[in-house]
UniProtKB/Swiss-Prot annotation:
The gene is purA. SMART domains: Adenylsucc_synt. Keywords: Cytoplasm, GTP-binding, Ligase, Magnesium, Metal-binding, Nucleotide-binding, Purine biosynthesis. It is found in: Cytoplasm. The lineage of its organism: Bacteria, Pseudomonadati, Pseudomonadota, Alphaproteobacteria, Rhodobacterales. This is Adenylosuccinate synthetase.
Length: 437
């Protein structure tokens, strides 16, 4: 049976939630392998809206096993609130349907406090645009070998020792930022209280995943955010704190890379970004605010963050960036989403290269100062007046919409496997089945 990795191929918000839900119907296991609750997934099923941040998208589908892997950083309090919310919507979540890797690092309240304090202290131009939810500091503690992990909740003595080690590092940091010391006893009490709620879901996920693989079960690996936010291959330092590309799927759950059969990249038919950082095709007017086309994309596409509510920056499709992502993630095919948002544009533009200091480039350079100076080189295409919303076959698409899709394929050097024409899961055109053996 084929195992599929789903990754965002831009800066996140590409519509992964819908595609994962669409694919999860035929998967047996759905696993989150990186990120935290800073990335939101919006699912629309039978007109009911589910907004998930920590939970895998597969939880809304009965009879599936959802997994939170060790590559994730997990806020246990947020997770339990999210479980309560989803249960209130009629979704059953039990230790039989949700497993959390025992070696998953936990996000502590002091991680979010540190995140926000640093962002507030940062001077203009150096802010990252973090969600302030503690993701970065939690990953820092993981790499610094002072993280508190799910398994630590099972033993009081171990837990208190882990807390003491973390505080030895964090209290001096807080002092330098003018933040009060952490209340050690209160934190320990909070952790002991939440332990009884989290531990029933704890499991040796690496073992379970390998058993499922050997049994021929179909596994769907669900990434958060987008590859252009990858800590190594994104627009550093305006990135997230984990690896987002497909290679992380294996290490993020404890399964071998030879277990991955297909990588599906989720690509929006235009480009958006939340927060700071370079964005060559961003549509801005002379006043630095979105121009008419940028406003139109944002309004039609409902471009507001699931997690923060922040308005997303909008721009034309950037073929160079997506082509890079197809290479770094080994993408076999893409799911092109939100094609319907482009309905009604007389002219569409696609970025086919950059001009940097008089030279033409076909990729975005690594250095941040060069990224900021890159100017897009556009190719124009004729738009279409007809509606593509809700289309479920190529025959329902306008000729110019098909031309646009085909040109995207040519420029990114990767085929379209799925085409999404609305937030509804069934408004999807299947070209290549990622789960096909």
């Amino acid at each position: 049976m084929a195992n599929v990795v789903v990754v965002g191929a831009q800066w996140g918000d590409e519509g992964k939630g819908k595609i994962v839900d669409w694919l999860s119907e035929r998967a047996d296991v759905i696993a989150r392998f990186q990120g935290g609750h800073n990335a939101g997934h919006t699912l629309v099923i039978d007109k009911k809206v589910y907004k998930l941040h920590a939970l895998p998208s597969g939880v809304v589908r009965g009879g599936k096993l959802s997994v939170i892997g060790n590559g994730v950083v997990l806020d246990p309090w947020h997770l339990m609130k999210e479980i309560e919310t989803v249960r209130a919507q009629g979704v059953e979540i039990t230790p039989e349907t949700l497993m959390i890797a025992e070696n998953t690092p936990l996000i502590m309240p002091f991680h979010g406090e540190l995140d926000r304090a640093r962002e507030e202290a940062a001077s203009k131009g150096t802010k990252i645009g973090t969600t302030g939810r503690g993701i970065g500091p939690a990953y820092e503690d993981k790499v610094g070998r002072r993280a508190i992990r799910v398994a630590d909740l099972a033993d009081d003595a171990t837990l208190e020792a882990r807390v003491d080690r973390a505080l030895q590092h964090h209290d001096p940091l807080r002092k330098g930022l003018g933040v009060e010391p952490i209340d050690r006893d209160a934190l320990v009490a909070q952790l002991k209280e939440i332990a009884s709620e989290i531990l029933p879901f704890a499991a040796p996920v690496w073992k379970v995943m390998n058993e499922k693989r050997k049994a021929g079960k179909r596994i769907l690996f669900e990434g958060a955010q987008g590859a252009l936010l990858d800590i190594d291959f994104g627009t550093y330092p305006f990135v997230t704190s984990s690896n987002v590309i497909a290679g992380q799927a294996a290490t993020g759950v404890g399964i071998g890379p030879n277990s991955i059969d297909y990588v599906l990249g989720i690509v929006k038919a235009y480009t958006t970004r939340v927060g700071e950082g370079p964005f060559p095709t961003e549509l801005l007017g002379a006043d630095g605010k979105p121009d008419a086309d940028g406003e139109r994309l944002g309004t039609r596409g409902h471009e507001f963050g699931t997690t923060t509510g922040r308005q997303r920056r909008c721009g034309w499709f950037d073929a160079c960036l997506v082509r890079q992502t197809c290479a770094t993630s080994g993408i076999n095919g893409i799911s092109l989403t939100k094609l319907d948002v482009l309905d009604g544009f007389e002219t569409l533009k696609i970025c086919v290269g950059y001009e940097l200091d008089g030279e033409r480039l076909d990729y975005l350079p690594t250095a941040a100062d060069q990224q900021a100076r890159c100017k897009p080189i556009y190719e124009e295409m004729e738009g279409w007046s007809e509606s593509t919303e809700g289309a479920r076959s190529w025959a329902e698409l306008p000729a110019n919409a098909i031309k646009y899709v085909r040109r995207v394929e040519e420029l990114i050097q990767c085929p379209v496997a799925l085409l999404s024409t609305s937030p509804e899961r069934d408004d999807t055109i299947l070209v290549t089945d990622p789960f096909a053996d």
